[in-house]
Amino acid sequence: MGKFIKQLSKFGKKVGGALTSNTAKKIYKTIGDTAVRFAESDIGSAAIDGLIQGSVESVLTGESYGETVKRAVLLNVLGAGDEIPDPLSPGEQGIQRKIKELEDEMKGEVVRTKHNEQIIRRFGADLDEVYKFAVSEYKEGVEEKDQFEILKKALTSYGELTKAEFGELKRLEKALQKESSERSKDESMMVKEYRQKIEALKDAIEVESTGIQEEAIQEIAGMSADILESAAEEVPLFGGGVATSIATARAIEGGYKLKKVINALSGIDLSHLRTPKIQPKTLEAILEAPTKEEIKDLSLVEGIQMKLQNLEENRNEVLHIQEEILPKLREAMIEDHKEIGDERDKRILPKTAMRFKVPTTQQPVIQIYSAPWDSDDVFMFHCISHHHLNESSFLGFDLELEYVHYEDLTRHWHALGAAQEVTGRSLKEAYSEFFQLAAQIDGAGAIHQKRLIRSKSYHPIYLGAMHYDIAYRELKNNALKIVNDSEVQKHLLRGPKHFQRRAILSALKDGVKLLGGVDLAEFMRYA
């Protein structure tokens, strides 16, 4: 279990300290009267933000300009990744979720129609049987399908898809780790094709990164979503060229409605089994590579290893459902049919499915809460892992006080969980302590302090949930980076409050990368 409680860092703190501290006279002598007058003037005070703030701050405090202001880039791509809504806006979240579902359904249908024969040949006729069950019309007198068998086939097919994707990616990882002279013909071709995609991404990102403003946290945009997804897909199972025709495991699952059938029959929601279209670690490698230079193989391997970790979590989750939950569901089916005296035991009764429903607040997503009072400033994320891992963590922010609280939480007990007993601290204990400690911080206004103490006695307001595409361990690492890296905090905590909240959520879901600072002499030449 880990716990971190910290003050957040913002730009401007060192400037204020330098102008009012006991060392001011020494600094004034060093930098001269002109710079001091500028910093203390109304115009200077207003302008000490972003790039100008970084310049003045570095002069006043003697810091390296490059260490003062860097360019911050969120490691997702607009159009290709999920665009991040304001976490405190359930309406924005709902619209984005619905649009995403419709897009995925459309792409899945295109893949199923175009590659159906190849897919069935490789993964078996069970896929087709599950799809026909999902779309078939009920007819009187036609023999009813054994729903438990359909459920087993859907889970087995999904397991085969994740296994195939994992295997192909593992092949690419091994090929990249070899010297080019040691690669087989197939491995060389695989690496060459992958590198061509990476170069396409790199070219697009370089065009965009030249326009990234030093004073703002940015997202990468520029290529259309289809082209980006096509470029980012390491090893498509079939097809290629345009994203809508790439048969990835994600697209095949959607096309044959595997998750929908599993959820409809058993109540088991597997919507959290996802992989990012573009791996954040791969974007980081591209951003770190010098312009016009080739990205090192080992840097690309890191991105692939993160995706393998993500796929491993998904595979283990499907295995957990198959090995631990399905036998229990079969027993529950028999019990429930006996109870109502129904001999048609091919059906999974709604009562049986409801036994395996997981409460909304314990599903493997980022659960979002706000304080009952001062909700715009005080909000929390409850990050929950896959069912088989059974871990969770708490991340709370008070933007008014510039305060953050992180804590690893208890293992949940529920129908799909792996925990045999509940251990550790609960969400209630974590948010109560968060409110209590925030209220004790120096500088808290009397009204804000009262509201924090009052909030401690009430449950936070539940505002919805966001899926995350990366592995839970990577999500935790992102949270700890936000908590412990003062440079990252300075870039996240800028702009309007809704922009700050959105940046924090994106940094948690996708990660954030700080690029190098801008040369001070170059800036002053054009200032």
UniProtKB/Swiss-Prot annotation:
| UniProt cross-references to Pfam families, sorted A to Z | Orbi_VP5
Listed GO molecular functions? structural molecule activity
Task: List cellular component terms (GO).
Answer: viral outer capsid
Record InterPro entries: Capsid_VP5_Orbivir (IPR000145)
GO biological process terms, semicolon-separated: symbiont entry into host cell via permeabilization of host membrane
> Mostly located where?
virion
What function does this protein fulfil? VP5 protein is one of the two proteins (with VP2) which constitute the virus particle outer capsid. Acts as a membrane permeabilization protein that mediates release of viral particles from endosomal compartments into the cytoplasm. Permeabilization activity is probably negatively regulated by VP2 and is triggered by endosomal degradation of VP2 and exposure to low pH.
* Name this protein carries in UniProt: Outer capsid protein VP5
Question: What is the gene name?
Answer: Segment-6
